[in-house]
Amino acid sequence: MISLESQVLERHLSFFDGKSVLFAGGISDNFPQTLASKCSSIQIWSCYFDYARTQSAVNFSVEFQGQADLIVYYWTKNKQEVNFQLIQLLAQASIGQEILIIGENRCGVRSVEKTLAPYGEIAKIDSARRCGLYHFSLQNKPHFELKNFWKTYQHPTIQDLTIYSLPGVFSAAELDTGTELLLSTIDNKIKGKVLDLGCGAGVIGSVIKKSSTNAQITMTDIHAMALESAHKTLSENQLQGEVYASDVFSDIEGKFDLIISNPPFHDGIDTAYRAVTELITQAKWHLNQGGELRIVANAFLPYPELLRQHFGDYEILAQTGKFKVYSVKN
């Protein structure tokens, strides 16, 4: 079944006739493939590996190089990510470039008029399925350089490390309180293979590597900007580690002595438990004998029962009024 956004686009198929089309943003279905016979060519650019791995010929990357007669951009709740991607697309487009922007109202798509007004003409052309569809024509090209989008931060909890992050990465500008609590449970005695799952900008894995130099660090995430950020955080701090894309355990090989995570429980603007449920239910198959799963979570989330079902006893290593750090052994 196609998304609400794609259902609105289906009402405007004449836009696609005979054109080369680039789909980008938060696309989550196979709508582009259904237009193969209508368009002269189709490209898809996504920064989400959980989508890219399920579709054919998706460009999974931070930066995209290419042009098309028509760009279709699926708006997301992550405004920093939206701005980062749209500026990229506009910077390499030609004057007169045609763009359709589609998004759910609850995700803030209405702000597209203010976002794109400095660069051309924009008008709302449809409203249905609780979505808005906008047509944009480029008149003033912006300038894009990746180096201008990097943010950095430091924090007493992370010693002398500097964390690097791109737009859209979780807790991009400062250390979040959940991760800070999780880091308070880390000592300098961690050994063996460590998996920082859902690594974001790489703060957890980097802190472990800095304090336990013999630990072998692997970092994974589904977000292209997070992976690029984790790479840079490691390299700029002269730390060694492996970083690659995986949707929870989809591309994980081997077993680990410690799997550690501040797992996401938001999917766009909804609370979604799929990722953390897979993390807890499948972790034992990726842990060495005696290995540990350690996660931080909002105290109200129903993870204790899942942990009990799949591991038996669990331990709370640290807690505040809002967060708890859980530990289970294989």
Curated annotation (Swiss-Prot):
Cellular compartment(s) = Cytoplasm
Signal sequence span per UniProt?
none
Reaction catalysis annotation: guanosine(1207) in 16S rRNA + S-adenosyl-L-methionine = N(2)-methylguanosine(1207) in 16S rRNA + S-adenosyl-L-homocysteine + H(+)
Q: Does the keyword Methyltransferase apply?
A: yes
Write down the SUPFAM superfamilies for this protein, in alphabetical order.
S-adenosyl-L-methionine-dependent methyltransferases (SSF53335)
- Keyword terms, alphabetized: Cytoplasm, Methyltransferase, rRNA processing, S-adenosyl-L-methionine, Transferase
A GO molecular function for this record?
A: nucleic acid binding
Question: Could you tell me which InterPro entries the record lists for this protein?
Answer: DNA_methylase_N6_adenine_CS, Mtase_sm_N, rRNA_ssu_MeTfrase_C, RsmC/RlmG, SAM-dependent_MTases_sf, Small_mtfrase_dom
Q: Could you name the Gene Ontology cellular component terms for this entry?
A: cytoplasm
Fetch the Gene3D superfamilies from UniProt: Vaccinia Virus protein VP39
The protein's predominant localisation is cytoplasm
EC assignment: the record states 2.1.1.172
Give the family from UniProt: Belongs to the methyltransferase superfamily. RsmC family.
Function, please?
A: Specifically methylates the guanine in position 1207 of 16S rRNA in the 30S particle.
Q: How the protein assembles, per its UniProt entry?
A: Monomer.
Q: What PANTHER family does the record point to?
A: RIBOSOMAL RNA SMALL SUBUNIT METHYLTRANSFERASE C
* The protein, known as: Ribosomal RNA small subunit methyltransferase C
